[in-house]
Amino acid sequence: MAQESQHGSKTLYVHPFDNETIWEGHSTIVDEIIEQLKENDISLPRVKALVCSVGGGGLFSGIIKGLDRNQLAEKIPVVAVETAGCDVLNKSLKKGSPVTLEKLTSVATSLASPYIASFAFESFNKYGCKSVVLSDQDVLATCLRYADDYNFIVEPACGASLHLCYHPEILEDILEQKIYEDDIVIIIACGGSCMTYEDLVKASSTLNVS
């Protein structure tokens, strides 16, 4: 990009997660969700949580903006899911201020950001969001189970959020409430292109995932 700029070409760098334009793009997911809920005659009070995986906080920030635009940011809790080894948001929350991770070790490479966007950190505290950190073993097991159930491959970054589908007790614990059959929990299933099934099996074998 620098070389192209020197030659007179117009260039534009868009940060992968710490950028308002990116957040606005992600925020439209919430608009689509609300539209689909209305089409299916599902009332918003039935939505008990919205779950998404978090790396640098781009998707999370967009979801917050979308909820806020629809006056739902204080009504629907967002559950931010990370994997141990790149849990920069959770570590920042524990410290009380944003931290920078010197080393990223999780297999969920799409979540591997050394820092969290400041807007994401501030929004988490402002709207009372929830933080969950999972092990690589748990996430890989979920990816393999999902592949068996639906014949579809997702990468660990996505498996982190899907893990709560298979283990609702984690969600109930973090929300401090029972999830009933008629309740709605929205899971943002993002990613899928960074790993093949063979990659998942190999990583699972290395980490002794049963």
Swiss-Prot record:
Cofactor: pyridoxal 5'-phosphate
InterPro entries tied to this protein: Ser/Thr_Dehydratase, TrpB-like_PALP, TrpB-like_PALP_sf
Keyword annotations from UniProtKB, A to Z: Cytoplasm, Gluconeogenesis, Lyase, Pyridoxal phosphate
Keyword Lyase tagged: yes
Pathway it works in: Carbohydrate biosynthesis; gluconeogenesis
EC number annotated for this UniProt entry: 4.3.1.17
Single GO term (MF): L-serine ammonia-lyase activity
Top-rank EC class of the record's enzyme: lyase
Domain of life: Eukaryota
GO biological process terms held by the UniProt record: gluconeogenesis
Record carries keyword Cytoplasm: yes
GO cellular component: cytoplasm
Coiled coil: none
Catalytic activity: L-serine = pyruvate + NH4(+)
Main subcellular localisation: cytoplasm
Compartments, as annotated in UniProt: Cytoplasm
Cited SUPFAM superfamilies: Tryptophan synthase beta subunit-like PLP-dependent enzymes
Pfam families per record: PALP
Assigned protein family: Belongs to the serine/threonine dehydratase family.
Name by which UniProt lists this protein: Putative truncated L-serine dehydratase SDL1
Higher taxonomy: Eukaryota, Fungi, Dikarya, Ascomycota, Saccharomycotina
